[in-house]
Structures are given as structure tokens and as C-alpha cells.
Amino acid sequence: MTAHKPGDPTTLNRLYGRSKGKPLRAGQQDLVDTLLPQIAVPLDGEVTARRLFGFDRPLHFEIGFGGGEHMAARADMLPDHGFIGAEPFINGVAQALVHVAGDHGQHPPLGNVRIHHGDALEVLRRIPDGALAFVYLLHPDPWPKARHAKRRMMNDGPLDLIAAKLKPGGEFRFGTDHPIYLRHALMVMRRHRHQFEWLAKDARDFQVRPGGWPETRYEAKARAQGHEVWYFRWRRR
């Protein structure tokens, strides 16, 4: 395993940045108070599909799900799979709960989603090795200043952890619209090519969003601002 530098995200027991923005709307606060306790990832002990959902099923893990659009859409596409999402920002958690709750009409509730309000790596450590089918890291905070590079989730420590938790043949997906983070990510992933196979045959494979990859609000915002967006898929060796 790679020796991790001091300050690597896996060595830090804290989160950077804000954890709350605008006050929650009444409906969102109600979901945080009532639905979140029902679908929250347990705060201790092993995190397995059987414990979360009552039986074994393919597991997906999203690191920092934002407003939950991608997680909810994937969960709707794959109702027999289980989805775990972690997000430190309570406003994002509240928005994800809206997606999970559905409207009891055209969009029924999603029973295959579990949410952790807090540090994704804390939960990831408690998942058994080789248990995950997919891990998603979509439009993470780029921390563009060089002195903050160690705060990026795309670093050696988190990648070793992701590699350990993915089953052989499992898939790691990464998306960004930030050129500095793009270069950083490719540099880091090159160091981990013994663990991951890059699933790209030509430039189009990372310049066009693949099928089965729902758009996030951050991606939509980036496109509206004229940014180029890049999509990466790696398979666990």
C-alpha cells in the first residue's frame, strides 16, 4: 500500500469547508427529522448489504453526492442494487431525501438508498474489502490552490481505500469540469495503475458522458457556464 503523506484525507479526522448553507425549508427539515433516521447508515460496526437492506445485493457507494440527483437516478435504474451515499453538507442531504421520498405518484419512494451525513471515508473504512461494485466521485471540491492539494479526495490514501473496497472488476467513476483537478487526478491515477485499468479507448470516451451516468446539478451548472466536462471510468484489477 502507498505510504501516505501527512495531511492526506485518510489521515485527517475532520472535514474542510461549510457543512450548512441556507436554512432548510419546512418540508426538507421534516425529512431530515423523520426519513433520515430510517435510512441512515449505522454510526458504528460493519457496513454490509445484508445489514443495510436485509439481504445481499450489489453495493454502490457515492462520495459526496451533492443534491443526490445521480444517486437517486442510479438507484431508480437499478432497483435490485443497494446505494450508499455520504455527504457532509446538510442541505445536500436534505435535497437527496426529497429524491428518496418520491412523490408517491409518478416517482415512488426509493427503498434501496442509505445515507450518511458526514465523512465518506469513515463509512468506507467500515465496508468489507471487496464488497463494492461501484464507487462514484463526481465533481468533488477541486481545492485549486497548490497548498490545498492534499485536501482533494483524489489522493493516494483515499484511492488505496477505494481499491480495497471495490471487488475485482468493480468500477470507479470520476467526473470533473476543473482542469487543475483533471491533471491532478490523472497524475494520481497513474500511480495506481497497478490497481485500476482505465476504460478509455479514445478521447471521446472521457469527453462524452457515458450511458447510465445521470447528470448532476453541478455538471449542468458547469455546462451552462461553458465549461468542458470530463468523465472517467476505471476498472479494479
Curated annotation (Swiss-Prot):
HAMAP family registered for this protein in UniProt: tRNA_methyltr_TrmB (MF_01057)
GO CC, any one term: tRNA methyltransferase complex
Family named by the database record: Belongs to the class I-like SAM-binding methyltransferase superfamily. TrmB family.
Region (Disordered): 1-24
Primary enzyme class: transferase
Role: Catalyzes the formation of N(7)-methylguanine at position 46 (m7G46) in tRNA.
Binding site for S-adenosyl-L-methionine: 62, 87, 119, 141
Residue numbers annotated as active site: 141
PROSITE patterns membership: SAM_MT_TRMB
Pfam families: Methyltransf_4
Domain of life the protein comes from: Bacteria
Organism (species): Sphingopyxis alaskensis (strain DSM 13593 / LMG 18877 / RB2256)
Keywords tagged on the record: Methyltransferase, S-adenosyl-L-methionine, Transferase, tRNA processing
Entry-linked SUPFAM superfamilies: S-adenosyl-L-methionine-dependent methyltransferases
A molecular function GO annotation: tRNA (guanine(46)-N7)-methyltransferase activity
Pathway(s) per entry: tRNA modification; N(7)-methylguanine-tRNA biosynthesis
Residues given in the record as substrate binding sites: 145, 177, 216-219
InterPro entries membership: SAM-dependent_MTases_sf, tRNA_(Gua-N-7)_MeTrfase_Trmb, tRNA_methyltr_TrmB_bact
Protein name: tRNA (guanine-N(7)-)-methyltransferase
EC number: 2.1.1.33
Catalytic activity: guanosine(46) in tRNA + S-adenosyl-L-methionine = N(7)-methylguanosine(46) in tRNA + S-adenosyl-L-homocysteine
